[in-house]
Amino acid sequence: MLDSIIKILFGSKHERDIKAMLPILHKINEKEAWALSLSEEEFKAKTDEFRERYQKGESLDSFIPEAFALAREAARRILGERPYDVQILGSLVLHSGKIVEMKTGEGKTLMSVAAAYLNSLTGKGVHIVTVNDYLAERDADWMRPVYSYLGVSVGVILSNMENDARRIEYNCDITYGTNNEFGFDYLRDNMQMRLKDKTQREFSFAIVDEIDSILIDEARTPLIISGAAEDDTQRFFEVDRLIGQLKEVEKNPETGEYPNELEGEEVIGDYTIDEKSKRVSFTDSGMLHIQDILQRQGLIKSGNLFDEENFEYIHYFTQSVRAHVLFHIDVDYVIQDGQVQIVDEFTGRVLEGRRYSDGLHQAIEAKEHIKIAQRNRTLATITFQNFFRMYDKLSGMTGTADTEAVEFTKIYNLDVVVIPTNLPVARKDEHDVIYLNENDKFEALCTEISEAYKRGQPVLVGTVSIEKSELISKLLTKRGVRHEVLNAKNHEREALIIAEAGAKGSVTIATNMAGRGTDIKLGGSPEMRAKKRTGTNPNPDYYEKVLAEEYAKWQSDYNEVKELGGLYVIGTERHESRRIDNQLRGRSGRQGDPGRSKFFLSLDDDLMRLFGGENLKNVMSKIGMRAGEPIEHPWINKSIEKAQTKVENRNFDIRKHLLEYDDVLNEQRSFIYEQRNAILEDENLIERIYATLEEFISEKFDEYSSSSKAEKEERARLIKDIFREKFSYTLTEEDFANIDKKNHEEEINEFVEHFTKELKEKEALAGKENLNMFIRYQYLQAIDKKWLDHLENLESLREAVYLRSYGQKNPLTEYKLEGFDIFYSMLDDIRIEIASRLVRVQISTEEEAHASRQMRSIQGNAQHNSMGSFSGSGHGMGPTALSARSRPENAQVVRTVPKVGRNDPCPCGSGKKYKYCCGKNG
């Protein structure tokens, strides 16, 4: 293998990448005999030595030859598998922070061991990211003995774990988990009220398995933690029963295009749809029709559709039309246990726990006449794009990445390196065959499957939806072809079905579920057959005996299937992405095995219909092609690839555009989370309050003093209101006269002194630690509340700026400018809110509290709080409440009562400030 790699001369970028790593590979191979001579104790001792050297300043790169040799030898001793040179090269690529493209069956899981081991030596933790819990747990269990032999701990994060268990797993040297769990834990950590409740460490190094699936396919789907919002479920039912009265705009029969309403062309219908982007737009007449429908139904009591109280009906109608016209059962979603479950278009799997946002999920539930779940409010959100960009070093592996190399470079600054296979690929990829219509296509491919079935060649049929997989199943049943169906409805049998997909005579119809994380062996799986015979928890000796028998039988089956040509992969439709097609092809021809692949297409397929089918249809008409006749030519393949490239470029632009918007939110989120963490760690929050309050007041006074004469009166009123309502502090005309002269340092100092004195009094009664706990809770509560409101404001802004493009304005620029304006406004609100809460909280003596309790009892107040707590403006103490044990003697916190501020007019009626009158000696 090494000799064949050395022969690579100047060639493609990938060949040059490989050539540059060969000297390091030589050094690793030279250390193999040294590693072979070490005992298990010496392996662990070497790991400790590496850690110590790293802490003293040596780089990880200086350990590569020895560390990789140790990892390779540990795998050989524990698993009986010695990583090939190509796997070592792949691990070098991972360590360098790049993406490895390695074909299916070449051992990506084993390839990651050396890179993960080397980077675990930093003590900062390594995250290995998989697409589901099953793979995370399987890979962790499989590789844990290897890492343990090296003296490295391994953890795994699963969806059903509690916080304490997660923290333990994250503190391991290497942690396996899914992209969802890592992302959600980040969001949950930044919602915690106590530092000790956080689970994750810093984001140092991540290896992402199936990285193209996570960073490309799921890039447009943000992670969202949500809570209950207002209940508007009845509106979805109301609108759903009315939606049948609306009609799609009639298209021009010659061009297949909608008439242009802006150019005065006649429009017949209420709405237009864009299947590519799944958008719905109402015409002017459609809007009036909706208004008329709502008025006749009595749903609009007064005014018109565009009045503020009625305008949201447009949103309900939009989502309802989308649900009926653009989202289809057994294609986009399935119904299981009375719930709408989303089907991943790329994997064919049910996305458990995921819901369409913005009311679309509720609209689909109304369409399907099942119980509508209440809409949720976003509490925290992040995209995978911005989550994974937080890692100091990011790498990944997949069987298909090269087609998206440009996007990986531009968005993530990740290079893609293609690693050659250990053995040459022997699969034969045939030209596509294309038919005029779908019926002809299905008839032809069922004939092809039947012929392969008769000769015993295993067949894997790839479909794009559950609906199509079930249709082909019915057609094959009529022909007497025994087969298995694998889709989101029967995913629990996935392991068993895939294990036998390479057996002689097997026919497997699968959605894209069969495209990832699976390894189809020719002749079937002897391990699965042995487990089936021995049952669960068999006697080890008996299991080994049965396994040996199955292996002997499998060897004969394997040779027979090889003679038949290996696994025959048949695609029933081209996907929008070439990667998905390549994944399907990659099920066949693993590790030098023979194989065959072929796609059967028609002009009715979505890709052909939406992206370039008209050109092909015209060509086929000119050459006199008839129904039932196929066409097979390299030109067809090029034309289809061109259509796919067009879609890929379009989808890349969409993802890039979404990221540009999300970067605005990401910058703001990072700032808020940094502030939150600082507050969790700060043991002297009073000083932070003083500083932020002084800064805020100074800004407000500066705004007043620098404003024009016409603006001054309004600004003075606003500042007075803030000080009176939030701080119980009155600013006089004399104060504003000084501020106007830009001589407001005295006023600032006076206010801060007043505020400081009040807090010192409260600190003396409550105790510094308890007051700090209270301030922390109130601070975090204020941040969280304002941040949630801000997320909603940004979402509304994003929808609003979209329309400004019609006014020749750049929506993104508008979003950035206004987004940061409302962000800074939110920061002001937080500063005011926390200071206001501290001003209003009251602390009284035990005697006063006792008298107050007696008075409440006399008045018949049934509410009783057995735990003394801070309270102010209705804000409870929450988890940091002062208990009787922690409270200083004779001190108790009770509910807020009206009080006179030192700068308020004295209640005696003298006209003087309270501090200069009756409060002089207070």
From Swiss-Prot:
Binding site for Zn(2+): 906, 908, 917-918
Cofactor(s) it depends on: Zn(2+)
The organism's place on the tree of life at top rank: Bacteria
InterPro entries, alphabetized: Helicase_ATP-bd, Helicase_C-like, P-loop_NTPase, SEC_C_motif, SecA, SecA_CS, SecA_DEAD, SecA_motor_DEAD
Name under which the protein is recorded: Protein translocase subunit SecA
Complex and partners: Monomer and homodimer. Part of the essential Sec protein translocation apparatus which comprises SecA, SecYEG and auxiliary proteins SecDF. Other proteins may also be involved.
EC number, UniProt record: 7.4.2.8
Species of origin: Treponema denticola (strain ATCC 35405 / DSM 14222 / CIP 103919 / JCM 8153 / KCTC 15104)
Binding site residues for ATP: 87, 105-109, 519
GO MF term list: ATP binding; metal ion binding; protein-exporting ATPase activity
Role according to the record: Part of the Sec protein translocase complex. Interacts with the SecYEG preprotein conducting channel. Has a central role in coupling the hydrolysis of ATP to the transfer of proteins into and across the cell membrane, serving as an ATP-driven molecular motor driving the stepwise translocation of polypeptide chains across the membrane.
Cofactor note: May bind 1 zinc ion per subunit.
NCBIfam families: PRK12904.1 (NF009538), secA (TIGR00963)
Entry similarity comment: Belongs to the SecA family.
